[in-house]
């Protein structure tokens, strides 16, 4: 009985951490956003990564506040072709592009103010 209880607790704890996101990045959306001069935020994540989950919550709030910004994401270990295209080697990477230029990049950042500053960077 004790082993079953421990198994259930461990299973539940992993489900709490899991991100229920889907890949929203496509080359077409990214290229169009850059041609239109839009600020584009790209988040690389993994569904079992706690840091990624914290970043996703901050970026979900940012979507509500930054109406003119395009937010795209992808699962880094699953979508390796996207990671290679964007030169992203790590989960927890947030990259901001504007006018076909990379404006800023961070890895592991979970501070809301710093992420918002990254989005606003020129």
Locations of regions flagged by a protein language model:
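Non-catalytic, surface beta->alpha helical segment in thiol-disulfide oxidoreductase systems
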Residues: 98-122
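Short active-site neighborhood of thiol/selenol oxidoreductases, capturing the structured segment around
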Residues: 35-47
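Structural micro-motif
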Residues: 86-95
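N-terminal leader/targeting and pre-domain segments
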Residues: 10, 17-37, 118
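Typically the conserved alpha-helix immediately C-terminal to a functionally engaged Cys/Sec
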Residues: 51-65
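Extracytoplasmic/secreted envelope proteins and their assembly/folding machinery
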Residues: 27, 56-60, 80-83, 112, ...
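Thiol-based oxidoreductase modules, predominantly thioredoxin-like and allied folds used
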Residues: 44, 68-80
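Sec-dependent N-terminal signal peptides
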Residues: 4-13
